[in-house]
Amino acid sequence: MINEILDNKMSDIRSSGKNVKLESTTMTSVKDLPSWCFIKSRAMLKGDNKPFVVSVLNSSTETPSKGWKCVLFQTNINDKGQLWQLVDGHLLSQLYGSFVLDIDSDNNNGTDLIINSQIPSNNERQTWKLGSNGEIMNNQTKMFIGVKGSNSAPIDPSNNAQLVCESTTSVDNVCFQWDLEPSFPLNSILTQTTEPFPNYTDEKLKAYIYISNNLIKGIDDIRSQYTNSNYSFNSFSNELVNMKYPDSISKDSFDEIKTQLQSEFEQVDSIINLFNNYQQFHIGLFADNSARLNQIVSIIQFDDKTTSVAGSILSIISNILKLVLTFLPQPAGNFGNVMMGAISVSSAASTPNKVNVDPFKVELSKLWDSLSSNFEAILFNMGTMESMILKDWGKMKAVYQLLSTSLAWTPTMTSQLISTGATAYGISLLQMLLPEKYQIYCWNQNFDAKYGFAPGYPAPIPSDIPEYCTWTDENGDVLFIASTSDLRVHPIKEVMDMVWKDNVVVKKDFYRSRNGWSFPTSLVNRITRWLIPNVTNNTSIPMKYTIGDFKGDSKTTYQLDLPTFSTSYPLDVSHNNNGHNYHFTITITNALDNSKIASLVIIVSAVGGSFSKGQLGDHSVTKGYLIGDPIFNTSVRDSTSTCNIIVNIDYNDTN
C-alpha cells in the first residue's frame, strides 16, 4: 500500500488544471534544524578531487582533549573530528566533550586554531560569523580562518597543515575561503520574496499565447503547466527550435518570447530532474513496507509486540546524513542540502502533512505506522517545495543557479546514497529497538578497592561474555551488553553483526551511549538496592546534573558533567540511608549559564525483597526542552537497578 502512495505522491503534487493562473507561494519561515557539516576549504590540489576540511589533529586515531590543534585534512572515513555543527555562532565539534572551535591565545602569537571547552559566558573569541565570500570571521579579533603561511598568497593545501585565525591580503584567497557542506540554501530560497514571471502585453502577449497553444492545444498559459508531470519541457524546448512565427506577430517579439521560454523550459526540466532523483532515493530507501524493520525485530526476538519503543524521525535523517558525509563526502553536501531542505519544510508545514521532528513513543506493533506516516509527509512536502519553486520565477532562477554546485545530483549518486542510507536507517532502527530489551553493564576495576568490601563480595565479571558483546575502555572498565533481566543473556551474533557491520558504529559510542545510542547502564556489583541514574544529553547544549536530596541523607550530593550528545552516570550512589525504599532528586542545568532545564524526583522501591526498581515522581521541565518517559530497569542478580532520562530540544516549542 505505501509503495503505491509514495509512487504517486510527486505526480499528485505536480498535476494542475488547464489555463490556471499561477500564484507564487512563499513560506514565511522554515524551521532551522541541527545538522552536522564539513567546513570545506576552497583550496584544492590539482588532479585531486578529494576535499580538504577543518579537522582536529589525529582525532581519527587518538582521543583528543581540549587544546588540541585544528588542521587541514582530506575527508577521512569515521573521523568525528571533521564534523561540526553551527550553534549560536559556535562551531561545535562532534568529538566527545562539548568542544568548540577556539583560538589558542598562548601559541603562535595567539593565532593557532584549537578545540576548547565552551566558556560559560558570552565570549566572542569562540563565536564566528560566516561571510558572503566564503570567509569565516572571529567575532572578537575580526580575523579570518585560514591556512598557516598563506595570508599573503594561496599555497597548495596539505594534510595536517596548521589552521590559524589571521588577516589576509586578498578577499579571493582560497586558503581563507570555506563552505559549510551541507549549507541548506533551499531554506533561504523558499522564504525569499516572491518574484513573478515576466509579464507581457500586446504583440509579446500574442506570441506567448500562440506558443502556449502550439505546445499544448487549448492552453494559453504554458507556465501554468510547469507543475504538471504529464509534459516534458525538454521536448517542448526542442519543438520551440523549429517553431515558425505567424505573420500576425513580429519576428522580434516572437523570438524574444521564444528565447525566454527556452531558458525557462531548461530550468523547469532540470529542477524536475532534481526532485525526481530525490524521489527515487526516498522510495528506494523507505518504501519497503516495513520489511527492514520486521527483519530487525525478528532477529532481536521481541516476544511482546506491545513493548513501547522510543524513536525520532530527526534522528533517522541525521544518521543518514552523517553516514553519507562520512562515506560519500563528495556528493554528501549536495544530498544534505536537498534532504534537510525537505525536513525543514516538512517540520514547518501545516497539518495533516507536518512531520513531527520531536521524539515519539509507541507500541512496537505501531512503530511502522508512525515511521511511514512521517516518510509519506516528507515526500508530500518535497513535492510541495518543488511546486513552490516552479511557480516562482525568482525561486526557479535561484535553484537553477545551484544545480551545478551545491544542488548538483549526478545520475550515479542515487544508488550510492540508497546503499549508504540503508545502513544508516538500519542503525537508527537498532538505536530505537535495542534499549528496550538490553542494557549496558559496567564492571569498574576500582570498585572493590574504593569501598573496601571483603574479597568475593563485589560481583565478578561473567566468564562467558561473547567477544562481540563486550569492550574494555582505556581505564580498564569492562562494559558489555546483556538482557535487562539477566546480565548473562546476550544478543545473538546476528544482531551484533548488524551493529558492527562495516565498522560504522564506534564501540566507545555504543558502550558509552553517545551520538544516538542511549542505553541504560547498570553497575556490576551486589548492592542491588542502588539505582544508577543515567542522563542522556541529546542536544548541542553542554549540561550538568546533580543527584541529591536523598531521603534520610540531605548531605550526600553527586555532580556530573553532561557533554553534548552523550550520556553520563555516577559509578556509585552510596548514601547513609541503607534501606531499599528511598528517593532522590536529579536537577539538570545548562552548563553555560546554570539555568535549570529539568528537575525530577526518582522514587526507588524494594522488589522481591533484595532487588529494587525506580519510578518517576514529581518533575518539571523548562519550556523548549523535552524529557520523555524514562526507562526504568529492575536490578537483577549481581547488578544495580537503573534508569535513563533523555533530554531533547522541543522543536515544536521553539522558533
Curated annotation (Swiss-Prot):
Judging by the UniProt lineage, the source's domain of life is Eukaryota
Ricin B-type lectin domain spans which residues? 40-181
Q: PROSITE patterns per the record?
A: RICIN_B_LECTIN
* InterPro entries from the UniProt entry: Ca_Up-reg_Membrane_Reg (IPR051780), Ricin_B-like_lectins (IPR035992)
Any GO molecular function: carbohydrate binding
Keywords of this entry: Lectin
The Swiss-Prot or TrEMBL record describes its family as follows: Belongs to the cup family.
The molecule here is called Putative calcium up-regulated protein J
**What is the name of the gene encoding this protein?**
cupJ
